[in-house]
Amino acid sequence: MQAKGDTAIGCVLAFLRRQAFGIAVLACAATAFAFPSAFKEWGGVKLMSLVVPAIQIIMFGMGTTLSAADLLRVGKRPWAVAVGVFLQFLVMPFMGFLLAKGFGFSGELAAGCVLVGSVAGGTASNVIAFLAKADVALSVTMTCCSTLLSPFVTPFAMKVLAGCFVEIDAMKMMVEILKVVIVPITAGGIVHALLKKQFDAHKAVCDRILSFISMTGICFTILALTAPSRDTFAAAGVAIVAAAVIHNTIGYLSGYWLTRLVGRFARLGEAEARTVAIEVGMQNGGMAGALAVGVMNSAVAALPANIFSIWMNFSGSVLASWWGRTAGVRKKTVER
């Protein structure tokens, strides 16, 4: 007979395994906050200057996992994609603006709140969708679509909503998105097409390697952006964290319930609702951080994206763990 202590320890270990990435993200943020000088510069190189290359590597890895089928899938799931894009590029940027105003942020900090709401879906969303028993194929398609739209929509949203806080060079931002996101993804797609047989033959290994690279890149970005913005974070305190939590929660709730509402006549179910919720709630914080550094040259503007990334990766892991456990129960209920 198994002892209660063993059962408790097993539950704790299982929980830690499920939340491993979220815990790693929190640990990186706490470490950089506690020892900022250790993560500002290595060997004369400012770590913040390596954020853009890190995001480019992540985007290249994402490109190697995509195919033409991911885009063609839009025709099969138009309503789900439409709901996701609507929330991603209209509701989330506007909520970033309202939160910045509501919490009394100004200048680069306020612009950063709008920026994190104006970027595409996060690269970690596909992994979270898998763990949450959502529609992974739809998740990949939505991430792909929002990313391809971002060079045009993100600069426009920033110009309209963040222009009252700081001067926004929309053209420079468009070029930066093309350089940081679109070019690496395209290059990754070309490599995948040229080496398709090799990728298909070793898919499991490639997926594990790419996931590790992506997660490592995200953790590095958090370290590199938390250290130089520590003082601003300490000054903003609870307000900037509260704004990130509210923004993320609104993304999850609006994505889930609007999809359920549209699903009444568009044949969208629980899996689609979970997918849209994850895609909308999990913004590409790394991309927002790279734009803050590359276009605005500001660690302060990158702070909201950094806090959002830390929180969303933790909340996403918790949400995926809960949904993953309840998927079977909900399915049985529907079948009855």
Which residues does each PLM region occupy?
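Helix-loop junctions at the membrane interface of multi-pass solute transporters
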Residues: 73-74, 124-135, 260-263, 290-297, ...
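The feature identifies polytopic integral membrane transport proteins across all domains of life
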Residues: 78-85, 105-118, 134-144, 172, ...
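Structural signature of multi-pass alpha-helical membrane transport proteins
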Residues: 2-101, 159, 163-267, 327-336
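Juxtamembrane membrane-interface segments at transmembrane alpha-helix termini
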Residues: 60-61, 123-130, 153-155, 250-256, ...
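C-terminal-most transmembrane helix of multi-pass membrane proteins
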Residues: 293-336
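Hydrophobic transmembrane alpha-helices that form the pore/transport pathway of multi-pass ion
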Residues: 96-133, 261
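Generic hydrophobic alpha-helical scaffold/packing signal
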Residues: 246, 259, 277-279, 292, ...
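Membrane-embedded alpha-helical segments of transport systems
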Residues: 87-95, 118-124, 139-159, 178-184, ...
